[in-house]
């Protein structure tokens, strides 16, 4: 049986997924203190949103699952494309172009380093099929 993993999801964030992925790639695999420091000093629009999401996931882990804050790290974080809002941009001679305002769904999963060690031990002790 798989243990619960604390996670947080931000949906319909009005940031293009391509721009959000630049920030997300910086914190993948880092411990929580490092990730918060990186996000605090990253001059990208997506950084404050992802920092807020990281703090939410840490709070979920500490309050709901009683995990130790110092042992947490970012296990997986990814950005999926959300809705595209289509807007008209007027051009010359009465024509117009379509502007796609892209949104993102950002998912962040954290885990404890002790959970990682026990899952590796279970994999090694298990038999191969």
UniProtKB/Swiss-Prot annotation:
Gene Ontology CC terms, in alphabetical order: cytosolic large ribosomal subunit
One Pfam family in the UniProt entry: Ribosomal_L22
Q: Which GO terms describe its biological process?
A: translation
Q: Which GO terms describe its molecular function?
A: rRNA binding; structural constituent of ribosome
SUPFAM superfamilies per record = Ribosomal protein L22
Point out the coiled-coil segments of this chain: none
Regarding protein family, the annotation reads:
Belongs to the universal ribosomal protein uL22 family.
**What is the protein name stated in its UniProt record?**
Large ribosomal subunit protein uL22
> What is the scientific name of the source organism?
Aster yellows phytoplasma
Show the taxonomic lineage: Bacteria, Bacillati, Mycoplasmatota, Mollicutes, Acholeplasmatales
């Amino acid at each position: 049986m798989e243990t619960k993993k604390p996670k947080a999801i931000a949906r319909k964030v009005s940031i293009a997924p391509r721009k959000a992925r630049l920030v997300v790639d910086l914190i993948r695999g880092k411990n929580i203190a490092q990730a918060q420091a990186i996000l605090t000093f990253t001059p990208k629009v997506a950084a404050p949103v992802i920092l807020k999401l990281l703090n939410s996931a840490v709070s979920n882990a500490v309050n709901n699952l009683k995990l130790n804050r110092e042992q947490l790290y970012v296990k997986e974080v990814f950005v999926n494309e959300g809705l595209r809002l289509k807007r008209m941009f007027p051009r010359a001679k009465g024509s117009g172009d379509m502007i796609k305002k892209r949104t993102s769904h950002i998912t962040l999963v954290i885990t404890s380093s002790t959970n990682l060690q026990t899952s590796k031990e279970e994999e090694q002790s298990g038999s191969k099929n």
